[in-house]
Design a protein with these regions (language model features):
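Flexible "cap/lid" loop of the alpha/beta hydrolase fold
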Residues: 112-161
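Conserved acidic catalytic loop of the alpha/beta-hydrolase fold
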Residues: 70-88
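Conserved HGGG/HGGXW glycine-rich cap/lid loop of the alpha/beta-hydrolase fold
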Residues: 6, 10-65, 79-80
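Conserved loop-alpha-helix segment in the C-terminal half of the alpha/beta-hydrolase fold
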Residues: 228-268
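Alpha/beta-hydrolase active-site loop signature
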Residues: 30, 54-58, 97, 122, ...
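Conserved hydrolase catalytic core segment
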Residues: 86-131
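Conserved alpha/beta-hydrolase catalytic His-Asp/Glu region
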Residues: 127, 152-229
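Catalytic histidine-centered segment of alpha/beta-hydrolase-like enzymes
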Residues: 268-281
Length: 294
């Protein structure tokens, strides 16, 4: 299995398969490259696919510091240099999208061909001028999710990660699976139900302090000013059953991005690429194989 060492001495793991134009898969918080296991073989039939484990995730190492989005963007820059990749397309799920936003803020779009965003917002927290942030379900309640709710979430996360990791795994699925008391209905049928035991086990493997540090990094960012600077074609995908962000988020992003299209996935939540891999893979292949970036 390939690894490379960053300039701060961290050994990072990545998967690589296929030949041709590079496509980089960036996973979300608490996940790993394994969360793209339904995409890698399909995409590798057409492209060279690289799927890194972000620092602190999967088989990659971490330090107690440098747990920031700026560092993750630098890790990505160094991985591209290590593999001598001068141009690539990126498929970015959740935190992976914030990494590519941070990457563009620091390094521009010069080495980017196209971008696919999976169920993500440019700003996690709601504010007076932003109503497309996280909802109250993130603190197990109805309504909005504010600063105090975020602190509560962090305290629960750090108190008992094994218990909270189950909540994380459930929350990336469908919002219709929750009742008014924010209780998850495991008996219901939904897309991707067969993956739930695996999602539980994978989520448990994370370190609470790593997750908390990256969550703070994510929740303090506002990438709205970056969107108009993204000069490459973008595909915005989201789950119509997502617990995370409303459709208005993607309408806003489409208006701010110079070249973007939006596709909603019925019956899917935050993990739409896991829940409906065939539709997702076909949609992404069509986008990546369409006319190249200008």
């Amino acid at each position: 299995m390939p690894f490379f060492t960053t300039d701060d001495g961290i050994c990072l793991h990545y998967q690589i398969s296929g030949k041709g134009t590079a496509v980089i898969l960036l996973h979300g918080l608490t996940a790993s490259s394994l969360y793209f296991q339904k995409q890698i073989p399909v995409l590798a039939a057409h492209f060279q696919v690289i799927a890194p484990d972000l620092r602190g995730h999967g088989q990659s190492e971490t330090l107690s510091d440098h747990l920031t989005l700026k560092r993750l963007a630098l890790d990505l820059k160094q991985l591209l240099a290590e593999l001598k990749i001068s141009k690539a397309s990126f498929i970015c799920w959740s935190m992976g999208a914030q990494i590519i936003f941070e990457y563009i803020r620091n390094y521009s779009c010069g080495d980017i061909e196209k971008i696919v965003i999976i169920d993500m917002t440019p700003k996690l927290m709601k504010s007076a001028d932003w109503n497309c942030g996280l909802p109250g379900i993130f603190s197990r309640k109805q309504g909005d999710f504010g600063h105090e709710d975020n602190l509560y979430l962090l305290s629960v996360m750090l108190d008992n990660w094994e218990a909270y990791s189950k909540v994380v795994a459930q929350r990336i699925l469908n919002k219709s699976l929750y009742n008014d008391k924010m209780e998850f209905n495991t008996a219901a049928d939904f897309k991707g139900k067969e993956d739930l035991p695996w999602l539980y086990e994978e989520a448990k493997k994370n370190k609470a302090w790593v997750v908390a540090a990256f969550w703070i990094a994510m929740s303090t960012q506002d990438y709205r000013p970056v969107l108009p600077t993204i000069s490459v074609p973008c595909l915005l995908t989201y789950g119509m059953e997502s617990n995370y962000y409303p459709p208005e988020n993607y309408e806003y992003m489409q208006k701010q991005l110079p070249d973007a299209r939006v596709i909603a996935f019925a019956g899917c939540g935050h993990a739409l690429h896991i829940q409906d891999p065939e539709l997702f893979n076909n949609t992404v292949l069509e986008f990546l194989q369409s006319c190249p970036a200008k």
